[in-house]
């Protein structure tokens, strides 16, 4: 009769390819990037969350390399701009590490705009940085985005999620600014969650642009943003959505 596997290491080994590059085992103790985790646990206890800062920069630069190679293959003449989404981690040490890599920022809520201002006040970013403002625009979020734009953050780009939002910004923007439009993509068949509550439908985008943006001196359309609920997969669904977006 085979031996019953009931240890945590058994679960790890049958679930993951282990050990991975970051991990090693020495004398039955786990090391992470040559850092003895048991020593840290003895000092700080558990549960414990560790942020390994060098990994942030390596992953950002990996993404840049992948895009640069792909762009070179098709002779794409544009540029790739990596934007770090602040909601993935609000910790200052994470943001400061990420921003060492010539990147830009994406916000999702009113709270995030305070982070942008704090980064500027401490000299970590300047007013030329791209600030992509996604998410549903509640009144405080609209007010905070406008305060950024009105104070000279020239590359702050609110992404319009519904037709009413553009009027909210018209009322509070004192200068001209760039805007984006979020496209409402179709859901993948059999997907359990409905995530296209935000965005403007393909068929409405041109009319919306002509009516609300084209002749409004406060706005210049800079971006079309579309969100695919399952991320980038090599499937007919993904490529069909992409074709609809760019055609």
Features from the language model and the residues they span:
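A charged N-terminal "starter" segment
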Residues: 1-177, 181, 206-210, 214-220, ...
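Active-site-proximal beta-alpha loop/turn segments in soluble metabolic enzymes
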Residues: 184-197, 223-238
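Domain-scale recognition of functional cores that engage charged ligands
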Residues: 202, 215, 228-229
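Flavin-dependent oxidoreductase catalytic cores
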Residues: 186, 195-210, 240-244
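C-terminal active-site-proximal or functional interface alpha/beta core segments in diverse enzymes
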Residues: 8-10, 230-232, 237-247
